[in-house]
Design a protein with these regions (language model features):
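Class I SAM-dependent methyltransferase Rossmann-like catalytic core
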Residues: 15-69
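S-adenosyl-L-methionine-dependent methyltransferase catalytic module, highlighting the catalytic core
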Residues: 22, 26, 162-176, 180-266
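Aromatic-acidic/polar surface patches that form glycan- and anion
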Residues: 43-54, 157-160, 164, 199, ...
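Short alpha-helical segments and helix-capping/turn motifs at coil-helix boundaries
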Residues: 54-63, 99-101, 114, 243
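A general structural signal for short secondary-structure junctions and capping/turn motifs
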Residues: 63-67, 105-107, 247-249
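Conserved SAM-binding loop
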Residues: 69-192, 203-207, 259
Length: 266
């Protein structure tokens, strides 16, 4: 099993360490910048690049949503097994936080009824059903069986959709005015198919997907750059992707949109 050393070092230090370790470690190094940080200067661009997506989304769901006298219906697009391991902080930056996850799950279950949609998985006991969010007849199939969602959540799924604008239309179609949509998707990330990898989105791109079908009340929009300097090289068990022609990748930006649907146009 390979081990990793992440260091902020000079080239001469790197060569010395490499020799001393006798290649037992793969060294992920950054000659000039510390892991997790980067040098930035003032920019004329007005986007927010200080989002911590899972923390900020939890804050919105658990603290900022209006208090109601009923549990809210929460639909996850691309749910997999429905464990929401990143949102609930079971895994954060590759580190397991079991205690946090259990607390977050307990809080989640007091506030929400969970429903999941996945193209490869279903489990009636967890309210997870087969479905293609890009299907032209999705609305008809959905509304005949499931409640109108109060929240629609999708974590790093839209880049894998061949027709993400159809997904946006279907989300608006099954929702009501006031439904919260929470979308995260990569702006800059290496190629990773699951089963395919089609798109990257700017913060404005996520808004544009929905703008033809509804107006949005924007609550959070911008980028999570906390993983910007992490090098997902691959080639080890549990790696993000296998090694490919890109080699190292050090520009991991994720676009985030939290908004409420207003003035449906259909």
């Amino acid at each position: 099993m390979k081990k990793y050393l992440i260091a902020n070092i000079s080239k001469s230090q790197y060569l010395l360490i490499k020799k001393l370790l006798n290649m037992r470690f793969r060294i992920i190094f950054d000659f000039n910048l510390k892991k997790g940080n980067y040098i930035s200067s003032k920019s004329s661009e007005s986007y927010n690049s200080n989002i911590d997506r899972y923390h900020d989304i939890r804050q919105y769901l658990f603290k900022n949503l209006e208090i109601t006298n009923r549990k809210l219906d929460f639909l996850e697009i691309g749910s997999g097994a429905g464990d929401m391991k990143y949102l609930l902080q079971q895994i954060d930056s590759g580190i397991s936080h079991k205690g946090f996850a259990e607390e977050n799950l307990k809080l989640f279950n007091t506030k929400f009824n969970y429903y999941g949609l996945d193209i490869n998985f279903s489990d009636k006991s967890k309210n997870i059903f087969f479905g293609d969010i890009c299907d032209d007849s999705f609305q008809k199939k959905y509304i005949s069986k499931y409640p109108v969602p109060d929240i629609v959540y999708s974590n790093n799924v839209f880049e894998h959709l061949k027709n993400p604008w159809k997904a946006a239309k279907n989300i608006v179609d099954i929702s009501k005015e006031g439904t919260s949509i929470i979308i995260t998707a990569p702006f800059s990330l290496r190629y990773h198919k699951s089963p395919n990898d089609y798109f990257r989105f700017t913060h404005e791109g996520l808004i544009a997907l929905f703008s033809e079908f509804c107006d949005l009340e924007i609550l959070i929009n911008g980028y999570d750059t906390n993983m910007r300097r992490v090098n997902w090289q691959g080639d080890d068990d549990g790696s993000f992707v296998k090694e490919d022609k890109f080699g190292a990748w050090r520009e991991n930006w994720f676009s985030v949109l939290v908004a409420k649907i207003k003035n449906k146009k259909l």
